[in-house]
A protein has these predicted regions:
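Extended substrate/RNA-proximal surfaces in nucleic-acid metabolism proteins
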Residues: 1-102
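Charged catalytic cores and adjacent phosphate/nucleic-acid-binding surfaces used
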Residues: 79-173
Length: 173
């Protein structure tokens, strides 16, 4: 999505894809997705408003996944963790209820193997709320190189266990 919340796929092409993955938090693309000089509170607000905007669009949500909601694309360094932490439960609940109503999939892809315990809890909080609100999940490695796949099974097994995911929680296309 660009800074005007326009996704990079035109409606006439939706039918050409079995699955459409849309990242709402690529805020590291200064000038394209955001101004680039936002503070943590502004980035948290952008996280919410961009997901909300996506959920308002006329999309084939039965085959749309929202990519890597808790990754560093929100803000560099530890800023992304702070931004995720200051989003209220009420905002998460509102957004994930809407996601459930729309039928969109929520991607799980953070790397718990390289994340300390306190930070894992920051990552898990929105996903726990999403699960409570009835969202469905899919796994995405976001791998940019083959060696990344080496630990993915362990990673996803652990994330699924931490969230208590069952077959009924799967996003099925």
């Amino acid at each position: 999505m660009d800074k005007n919340n326009v996704i990079g796929l035109s409606p006439e092409n939706y039918g050409k894809f079995d699955f459409i993955v849309i990242p709402t938090n690529h805020l590291h693309l200064s000038g394209f997705t955001c101004r680039g000089d936002e503070d943590v509170r502004e980035r948290a607000a952008l996280w919410c408003s961009r997901l909300d905007s996506l959920l308002e669009q006329d999309l084939p949500f039965y085959k749309v996944g929202v990519a890597h909601l808790t990754d560093t694309g929100i803000m560099g360094g530890r800023g992304y963790l702070e931004a995720l932490s200051i989003i209220s439960d009420e905002d998460y609940i509102r957004l994930f209820r809407k996601a459930t109503r729309r039928g969109v999939g929520i991607e799980l892809n953070f790397n718990w193997l390289k994340t300390n315990d306190d930070d894992v809890e920051i990552h898990l909080r929105p996903y726990r709320i999403a699960k409570e609100e009835g969202c469905k999940f899919y796994l995405g490695s976001d791998a940019h190189a083959l060696h990344v796949f080496k630990d993915m099974k362990d990673n996803f097994t652990k994330i699924s266990a931490l969230l208590g995911l069952e077959d009924k929680d799967k996003f099925v296309i």
